[in-house]
Design a protein with these regions (language model features):
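Internal intein/HINT superfamily modules and their associated LAGLIDADG
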Residues: 1-255
Length: 255
């Protein structure tokens, strides 16, 4: 009887070991596949369309939210996804389509509450992790600003800038910038539009908080808004014409 009991115990122990081994193997395979996928995502492809990189730059300093992925940290590196939000679905679609046509993976649109106004809603989507996104996510603002071209500046302005119709100047908001980053932005705008340098101003709140922004002089804005309008017209972003000092137009107005 004792031998039988030991035999049964040994058999049960082997079954437990087999189950644990199968679980370990399954987990190992899954982790290996995940590692390969993350490695591909991390290294990415060579970007042929420079507009993608400029979208990533403008999102880093403006209207975009880089989110660290916890998965990458398990394998010893940092990866990011990127979230966009806007009231203007057509403008958001322009960005999403640009990523998708260049082979990158984006989520579907979601309706989300806006933090700017009570009971208001916007649209958002996310761009999944890939090599260039991870590189830009790890860059400093000053490094990003130094790499902006006119396209990137236009996107940044459309996201975080304003045009003042009656006085014909512009503002470029950089609320969370350090003084050094603000100075770097001033120099970049002047590098791209060497007409007259932007002035640094402060938005002072009643509670004592201060936020920096750039004042774009009339002479500089006159040239810059022509490029903004050309971009908007070319991409049929009629609802954003007010950013170039013109009345916004809907599709119905154009018919």
């Amino acid at each position: 009887m004792l031998g039988r009991s030991n035999s049964k115990d040994a058999k049960a122990e082997r079954e437990i070991l087999n189950v644990n081994a199968e679980k370990f193997f399954t987990c190992h395979v899954r982790c290996s596949k995940l590692y390969v996928l993350e490695k591909i995502s991390r290294e990415g492809l060579v970007l042929k369309d420079t507009r993608i990189t400029q979208l990533l730059y403008s999102a880093h300093i403006g209207d975009g939210c880089y989110v660290k992925n916890s998965t990458g940290e398990k394998f010893g590196y940092v990866s990011y996804c990127l979230n966009y939000i806007s009231y203007d679905l057509r403008y958001l679609t322009y960005k999403r389509d640009l990523f998708i046509t260049n082979g990158f993976s984006c989520s579907n649109y979601r309706i989300t509450c806006s933090g700017y106004k009570k009971n208001s809603f916007g649209f958002n989507f996310s761009v999944r992790s890939f090599g260039e996104l991870n590189k830009v996510g790890a860059m400093s603002k000053i490094d990003v600003i130094s790499r902006l071209n006119k396209f990137g500046l236009i996107i940044y302005y459309l996201d975080d800038g304003s045009y003042h119709q009656k006085r014909n100047f512009g503002h470029l908001y950089c609320n969370d910038f350090t003084p050094e980053e603000v100075d770097s932005l001033v120099e970049k705008v002047y590098e791209l539009y060497p007409i007259k340098k932007c002035a640094i101003r402060l938005d002072r709140k009643k509670d004592g908080r201060e936020y920096p922004y750039l004042y774009i002089p009339v002479s500089t804005m006159k040239v810059f808004k022509e490029d903004v309008f050309s971009f908007l017209k070319r991409n049929r972003l009629n609802s954003l014409y007010y950013k170039a000092g013109l009345p916004s137009q809907t599709i119905e107005n154009l018919r």
